[in-house]
Design a protein with these regions (language model features):
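Conserved active-site alpha-helix within GNAT-family acetyltransferase domains
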Residues: 69-83, 193, 217-234
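A short helix-loop-beta-strand connector motif used in the catalytic cores of GNAT acetyltransferases and
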Residues: 3-10, 58, 72, 84-86, ...
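A conserved beta-strand-loop-helix scaffold within acyl/acetyltransferase catalytic domains
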Residues: 133-183
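Conserved acetyl-CoA-binding loop-helix of GNAT-fold acetyltransferases
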Residues: 42-51, 178-184, 188-205, 226
Length: 240
């Protein structure tokens, strides 16, 4: 996961932490550090990590699988960091995915044109309660991620964007499926499960061995389980 997080970002090794920085966004979810497995950071390591983000005017954050570095979590808490959230992580190994076809009347396609990419983004933004005025720069960023090996799918109903999802470029056999979204008028039809299955099949076919995602809640966990994902531990997010 460290290699995957570093893709497309600048990095700095700070003690036992790999700090990653987005080149074009201050979004906290795009700027975070990951401790080495079994890391036992000193207080000076934690101070240096805090400073690495503070001098860039970024929120100091870490994200990692809790069981891989329990001492790191404790050291951060002692230094005044706080747990933002704990998120269950689910995995779908090759051979475990369930084929779920698109529901009747639903078209699944890889977005290629600007219109298709924008349609996917609008559906995602709307589903997650964000403003749907998608700037051209976001369309181009998405296109660049696809050119760099990322994955995406757009769900349409009668030509209208209904939902979508993405997966990161595969790094060392690992990728994350994310952004699974369905607009309110099209929910409870099985579109979310079909989108997830489409992306999962695509990354497996491209050689991914470790495919993971983080469900937002119990309903999402149930949906992903239908596709073949199983619980694999918790991701912890901390910030200062």
């Amino acid at each position: 996961m460290r290699r995957a997080a570093a893709a497309g970002r600048s990095t700095e090794q700070v003690g036992p932490f790999l700090a990653t920085f987005s080149p074009d966004s201050a979004n906290p979810f795009l700027n975070y550090a990951i401790p080495d497995d079994g890391a036992q950071p000193s207080s000076s390591d934690v101070d240096a990590l805090t400073e690495a983000y503070a001098r860039r005017d970024l929120l100091p954050r870490v994200e990692f699988m809790a069981e891989t570095a329990p001492a790191a979590e404790q050291a951060l808490l002692v230094a005044g960091w706080s747990v933002e959230r704990r998120i269950p992580v689910m995995l779908c190994p090759p051979g475990s995915a369930v084929t779920i076809p698109a529901p009747a009347g639903v078209e699944l396609l890889v977005p290629g044109t600007d219109e298709e990419i924008r349609g996917m983004l609008v559906a995602q933004y709307e589903a997650f309660g964000e403003p749907t005025d998608v700037p051209d720069t976001e369309v181009e960023k998405t296109r660049e991620r696809l050119r760099a090996g990322g994955f995406a799918v757009l769900a349409r109903v009668a030509g209208e964007p209904a939902g979508g999802g993405v997966a990161e470029a595969i790094v060392d056999g690992t990728t994350e499926v994310a952004g699974i979204a369905v607009r309110e008028p099209y929910r409870r039809r099985g579109i979310g499960a079909a989108v997830t299955a489409f992306l999962t099949a695509a990354v497996h076919e491209a050689g991914a061995r470790t495919v993971f995602l983080t469900p937002a809640g119990v309903p999402e966990q149930r949906m992903y389980a239908r596709v073949g994902y199983a619980p694999a531990g918790d991701m912890v997010h901390l910030s200062r």
